[in-house]
């Protein structure tokens, strides 16, 4: 298998849908040999669920059935790929290739787990579309890559919506999880403004991809989250363990998960006539993978020494399942029987080629020994030729670099060349301050050297077939090792490292509950606080008794930052990381929805208001009782009356659910929601006025906004005529006086209901508190007295 070598996802995705708008997806990761199956119902015509998954997997190839013969209502995903993913390679496969029966048989044969443990019988009817997509995807991979997927080698997972938090593609952009929002808008390069880039201190490609996957799909299982948090607790309190793990993880190859591909995929048999450069490269990659595996297995004893005294469940389980697993020692012994002990993984091209040529122990294959001698002789002849040219042409600084594409070539500093180079030098190219060139003698030796190396690779691969088959029997152990190393890399080199670079007590361990409040004390925006040292912290408290916050404030007062901050703290908590707050308790969120930003969407021919309404409609159609919704300035893109009516109506709809909603607005009238609905709380960002100018404090306070007509202040500063400003003030006073009288009347009517709700909120807090019975009893008595004396 060919390696992509980068951090970008190496997924191939198959997509198919039926008339009921059910979509089946199969996502095959070529690097880790894992297959992820998903089947779901699309609830919107814009295919938001499919977009979210495609954003998560970021496939390089998407396989779909043809459009021409498809019935109406069954071409949506194919059209979606054409419309939104034009840069991704689209492959159209005959509909007969999307065979769910064949897909089920393939999964049964290829999955590392037993069909019973995998739950294939249970999932067959529920995931028949994803099985059909799997059949087409595997067929394409085997045909395109020229390999056969070996039996019982794949890690297969059936993904349901209940497994992870769902964050739609729009929210991923609004929250700047992966890329800064203003990068695409303004073309800037400040990548550190995204959460992913901030935490991207992982050392392996697999760890980086796991971090990205966790940010896009945070966990929902409290036990798993707490297991990660327990591990972080031990790492933060035990410096020796933290630094020990940081050091030992560097000894493992960065591409450990790449090793799996060469054991999960078996090259198809080819004739001697077909053997050429492509097969030589595949042989070279296979040998490199065995050397990588040997390097990883050699580092396991050091990892065992570091983890031996670990207390937390996660690290103790790694020690037991990996470090004490005899299967790794068995694999290492088999490798040691044929691979030279002195061979190491190298990154320098010629050193790597030499290591691969001499990977096999001497004396195993006579033809290999002859090819090695030829390789050594030609390599020595090339270096002798360089020495000869240095003396003959008086070029003492002539260098002999090597790259895999052209082999050896000469590099000469331009300052050493007086006039024209001798005629012996060919292919002369200026490269910076140097001249790159070759000669006929060097070209001839390069051909012989490359041919000898290719013969070494092919002979070595032939000798290693038995070893490859033996290692494939323990493919599940290698899968476990790769997953463990990626997880440790993320927790140690990303989470723990990032927290350790912050001042003491800036990050704290969050508490996760199924039905408790969302409480964040002195929370901070994780990205902005790393850029601005004087970031102002703010708190939030939401519960069943107060499930909506209306946040008010002028432009630039901090509303949008606050909305982002709440969501990012929740996401960090649910990936099992400490959060930037003094204290945090989080009710596990199943979906995050955001409605932020105001721009026309030219691609979909939508105005700003139409974009707002489409995003709001998606939220209304998909919101659940455990969702977190943040909405910024809904309704400001149309007339004030229509905008207020729409914003009010949306708030009332969301209030009927148990979802937590944070609603930022300029509309003063929305503060009246709190006079009618006791589960609404109004907050505002405090702003001071000095010399008719706004002094932003970025401090969140209870109650409505107390800045008198900040719009008029800004208009006056902008230079509007004083007569216009004075007239506007008179009109505003009349409107405000009339509104205040009506609001006071409403407040009086609903005062008693608010008192009762405040009691209910205190009771809910006591329900989830960890105080002693005596403390709770005293708190209840104090609450009773406060209510009776109308002090509440």
From Swiss-Prot:
GO CC, alphabetical: condensed nuclear chromosome; germ cell nucleus; plasmodesma
Cysteine disulfide partners in this protein: none
GO molecular function, one term: ATP-dependent DNA damage sensor activity
Cross-referenced Pfam families: MutS_III, MutS_IV, MutS_V
Reported consequences of knocking out the gene: Normal vegetative growth but severe reduction in fertility due to a decrease in chiasma frequency at metaphase I of meiosis.
Residues annotated to bind ATP: 553-560
Record bears the keyword Aminoacyl-tRNA synthetase: no
Gene Ontology biological process: homologous chromosome pairing at meiosis; homologous chromosome segregation; meiotic mismatch repair involved in reciprocal meiotic recombination
Cellular localization per UniProt: Nucleus
Major location category of this protein: nucleus
Name this polypeptide is given: DNA mismatch repair protein MSH4
Native source organism of the sequence: Arabidopsis thaliana (Mouse-ear cress)
Gene: MSH4
